Amino acid sequence: MNDNHSFTSSSHTKKTKSYNYSKHHKNTLIDNKALSLFKMDDHEKVIGLIQKMKRIYDSLPSGKITKETDRKIHKHFIDIALYANNKCDDRITRRVYLSKEKEVSIKVVYFINNVAVHNNTIEIPQTVNGGYDFSHLSLKGIVIKDEDLSNSNFAGCRLQNAIFQDCNMYKTNFYYAIMEKILFDNCILDDSNFAQIKMADGTLNACSAMHVQFYNAAMNRANIKNTFLDYSNFYIAYMAEVNLYKVIAPYVNLFKADLSFSKLDLINFEHADLSRVNLNKAILQNINLIDSKLFCTWLTNTFLEMVICTDSNMANVNFNNANLSNCHFNCSILTKACMFNTRLYRVNFDEASVQGMGISILRGEENIPIDSDTLVTRQKFFEEDCTSHTGMSQTEDNINAVAMKITADIMQHAD
């Protein structure tokens, strides 16, 4: 084994170790300032681990890096962290910056406790479809603007404080990625794969995300606004405390998704599937759910205002302890639905199927049970004015106008 790749003997003094290290690796991997962050007794172990990493880099053909090699390098950094004073691997980061001059080149900077360990420009391999392969990288503080990243692969990536702005990300793969405080601003994400991602405090603003797979994704506290989600799949997605604002999402699949404690305003869910969705303690305002499925959906403790659910399947839906204002359920199926301890203001049940419903209405402090067979015929019961609730009257002519206005308001700000 040549001198450049040899290990320092344990019999050498600390002075000899430092000398040999400086001689063979100065300005290449790590300096004494970085080493000083580790315990003195651990210098030999640190140098040995870094030398292993250096040999891996030296073995790369033309500077290219593979998934397997990247995993090995990352593991060595984790091993190094275990010997650090803090024994924390979260202080180790790989920061990646896309080069505007050379589209396929990025600068990778390794940090240990905020000290630069290794600088290198490597070529990101292209995928078979022409995109770039960023898979399994740890990308912190990355900012990519106005780039074509279509067909790229970010599978298994860890993205922290990342920004993608004005990018074409058609058919991009984020499968199993971990995202913390990520922003997609004015990006094309159509036909992309976000299945099983873990996103915290992420934002999609003014994006086109049609036909996107969000299957089993964890997106708590996500902020999605002015975005198109047509035909996208959120099956069993966890989206607690999500904020959806001015979103076009016809035919979207939210089957068994969890949107508890969420806020939804100005949404077009026409022909959508929200069956078995958990909307406990959510706020729904100005929602178009015409001809949609809400079978066995949980709307407990929920506030609904100006929600249009005409011609929808809402059998077995649970409205217990909910507040409903200016909502339309005419011509919908509400068989065996539950509305116990519910407050209703200007709610339209014309021609709805309400057989087997369990209903008790809160009026002031009084809880009044109602026979479901007479619910529709007692429409005037829900026509009272309330100073804290305003809305359109219950005429059939106004229902389509309300739905069209909701969609028009969304489109006005989504262009």
Model regions and ranges:
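N-terminal capping/linker segments that flank leucine-rich repeat
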Residues: 3-8, 12-133, 372-415
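Tandem repeat scaffolds
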Residues: 25, 68, 95-98, 111-411
